[in-house]
């Protein structure tokens, strides 16, 4: 195994793996990555754990005034929270030069959670967009469809589908020990399904392209169609002076921002991954220079994708007055627990619930 193979021990929990494609190339990792990437991972971990925890608690507390959008946002935060708790493992992995000391089980589970988060996040955003589409474009006829029962069914479908699509990671991800470097990597191993040389190439390319199509391109296209119709309806029919329409505009602005930020964070990751997959199929350049560029860009594209998991709570706080108010009430409640009697706690809770307005 040469320098390139050592580096491509699948240092991130997706289907990106250039060991076959670039076995004749020499590659030297950019040394600052071993220090910079772990620091970024831990920063995302701290911000994501705190921010998404606050979002989940805020959504949970306002049960009586909870909007459909709040439920999807709560599940989006749950997906992000589940993912960020694995980041310390990946930080250690990178800091040790892509050596995995945590065993096979954590290798499989933490890799699975990363893809589960990717699918669940984009599906939650898609359902948010569809909910806004039904509420705005078909406001008079969508009442029967936008019920709690349908919402629960869609959430069940989101998590089941996400779990199934991420399942190949549980099957193929394992630890691989390299005698030459004395390192154990958390990598994809297709020996269970590969019987002839060259078949692994199609498995890697197929899984990579399908995950990008199902976990990014198709949902993003669906969301763009929704917002196209929404934009036309808002332009024609919304009255900027009506309070109900103002609330709908604010919520629409928040959700649109979430979608745009998600696309911006994940697009470089999917571009790098897709170009790598296409090079396997001889549909993209396979020169050492091009492959080295992909390998150098991949950890940072991955890191940018992970940043999305800590940005959403900041976006809620910046754009959503309702969310900010509830967070302030939450802080006041904590103070009241230490400084006020039970009556103060009750009044604070009533104030927090009164801030919620259905849209």
UniProtKB/Swiss-Prot annotation:
What's the protein's topology in the membrane?
Answer: Multi-pass membrane protein
- Give all cystine bridges in this chain: 25-288, 107-186
Task: Provide an example Pfam family for this protein.
Answer: 7tm_1
Task: Identify its protein family.
Answer: Belongs to the G-protein coupled receptor 1 family.
Q: Which GO terms describe its molecular function?
A: apelin receptor activity; mechanoreceptor activity
Q: Which residues lie on this side of the membrane: Cytoplasmic?
A: 58-75, 130-151, 235-251, 308-359
Query: Which Gene Ontology BP terms does the record give?
Result: angioblast cell migration from lateral mesoderm to midline; blood vessel development; cardiac muscle tissue development; cell migration; coronary vasculature development; determination of heart left/right asymmetry; determination of liver left/right asymmetry; endodermal cell differentiation
Q: Where are the transmembrane segments?
A: 37-57, 76-96, 109-129, 152-172, 214-234, 252-272, 287-307
Q: Which gene encodes it?
A: aplnrb
Name of this chain's protein: Apelin receptor B
Organism source for this protein? Danio rerio
Please explain the role this protein plays, according to its UniProt record: G protein-coupled receptor for peptide hormones apelin (apln) and apelin receptor early endogenous ligand (apela), that plays a role in the regulation of normal cardiovascular function and fluid homeostasis. When acting as apelin receptor, activates both G(i) protein pathway that inhibits adenylate cyclase activity, and the beta-arrestin pathway that promotes internalization of the receptor. Also functions as mechanoreceptor that is activated by pathological stimuli in a G-protein-independent fashion to induce beta-arrestin signaling, hence eliciting cardiac hypertrophy. G protein-coupled receptor for peptide hormones apelin (APLN) and apelin receptor early endogenous ligand (APELA/ELA), that plays a role in the regulation of normal cardiovascular function and fluid homeostasis. When acting as apelin receptor, activates both G(i) protein pathway that inhibits adenylate cyclase activity, and the beta-arrestin pathway that promotes internalization of the receptor. APLNR/APJ also functions as mechanoreceptor that is activated by pathological stimuli in a G-protein-independent fashion to induce beta-arrestin signaling, hence eliciting cardiac hypertrophy.
Per the UniProt entry, the glycosylated residues are: 6, 21, 182
InterPro entries in the record? ATII_rcpt, CCR1-9-like, GPCR_Rhodpsn, GPCR_Rhodpsn_7TM
Tissue specificity, in the record's words, reads: Mesendodermal expression at the blastoderm margin appears by 4.5 hpf. At early gastrulation, expression is maintained ventrolaterally while expression in dorsal cells and random deep cells declines. During gastrulation and segmentation, expression is maintained in adaxial, intermediate, and lateral plate mesoderm. During late segmentation, expressed in several regions including the forming heart. By 24 hpf, expressed in the dorsal aorta, caudal vein, and intersomitic blood vessels.
**Keyword Disulfide bond attributed:** yes
The consequence of inactivating this gene is:
Morpholino knockdown of the protein induces embryonic lethality due to cardiac dysplasia with little to no blood circulation around 6 days post-fertilization (dpf). Mutant embryos show pericardial edema and accumulation of erythrocytes in the intermediate cell mass (ICM) at 30 hours post-fertilization (hpf). Display decreased angioblast migration to the embryonic midline during late gastrulation.
Q: So what does mutating residue 90 to L actually do?
A: In grns608; defective in early myocardial specification
What GO terms fall under cellular component here? plasma membrane
Where does this polypeptide localize?
Cell membrane
